Amino acid sequence: MARWRPDMAEREATPEALYLRRREFLALGAAGAVGLLVARGARAGEPSGAALQVARRVDQAGGETPTPWDSVTGYNNFYELGTSKEDPSRNAGSLRARPWTVTIAGEVKRPQTLDVDALVRMFPPEERVYRMRCVEAWSMVIPWVGFPLADLVRRLEPTSRAKYVAFQTLLDRDQLPGQRRPVLPWPYVEALRIDEATHPLALLAVGLYGRALPGQNGAPLRLVVPWKYGFKGAKSIVRITFLADRPHTTWNDAAPDEYGFYANVNPEVDHPRWSQARERRIGEFFRRKTLPFNGYAAEVAPLYAGLDLRKNY
């Protein structure tokens, strides 16, 4: 599996056509770029949204080709915006990502409420290319933009009692119309152990493909934990709480026999209704083998030494 590579080139993370067009934009300068947009119009399939300044780029997907923008932003699970894969992109316009604040509470020495833009200024974003494996046995490769969750945790100074970190999604039935239906117990909550939250791979994402997160992908702030199934990645986060005891989490409460608290990608532990041994990479015809911990076993397996991963799925 590919190791940390701080020298990854932009071309490696971006499909060639998009890479070349981005270089064309930069060569023209601001005024020329505006003219180019007017002349050509918006092109389907290209990243949209505000461009983000990225401090560095790191490929942690073993050189695998990133999933196209259209698929990453058009095939989503975000029940707050609808339960079909296409609903989130159709309904994302109702989500207002600014102004936005995140409340930090619980077992920390520095509880506070942070503006999301101030948060980004504190921690310069970097691009990380990660595999993403859904519990539904499909997967993508996504060039996220964000900062290590561990950096925020350290700044907040958790107390010695803090053993877990919970992440809560916005509760607003106007902005997130899917919350009008009781398909899940709202608001959505997910959580990590404190050692998982401080692992270098855990990311708070603010963008993808060099652009601000679209609403359907969890704007303006979402959790990315690449060795776990995608439902662990809380979207549109408004509250982060440090806790002494393991909290209730949404899918684990709704269907504990199907959605474990740990949710580590494990090809040897099947979902009750389907196998987890193989997965369908979006955009590919044939299914591929699922890797333990989604290919990140060398980095994260020591976190679970001595833990029965069949029982603690």
Curated annotation (Swiss-Prot):
Residues annotated for Mo-molybdopterin binding in this entry: 76, 79-80, 134, 169, 217, 222, 233-235
Gene Ontology cellular component list: periplasmic space
GO-annotated biological processes: protein repair
Superkingdom of source: Bacteria
Post-translational modification remark: Predicted to be exported by the Tat system. The position of the signal peptide cleavage has not been experimentally proven.
Catalysis performed (reactions): L-methionyl-[protein] + a quinone + H2O = L-methionyl-(S)-S-oxide-[protein] + a quinol; L-methionyl-[protein] + a quinone + H2O = L-methionyl-(R)-S-oxide-[protein] + a quinol
Cell compartment(s), UniProt: Periplasm
Family: Belongs to the MsrP family.
Record-given protein name: Protein-methionine-sulfoxide reductase catalytic subunit MsrP
Native source species: Anaeromyxobacter sp. (strain K)
Species lineage: Bacteria, Pseudomonadati, Myxococcota, Myxococcia, Myxococcales
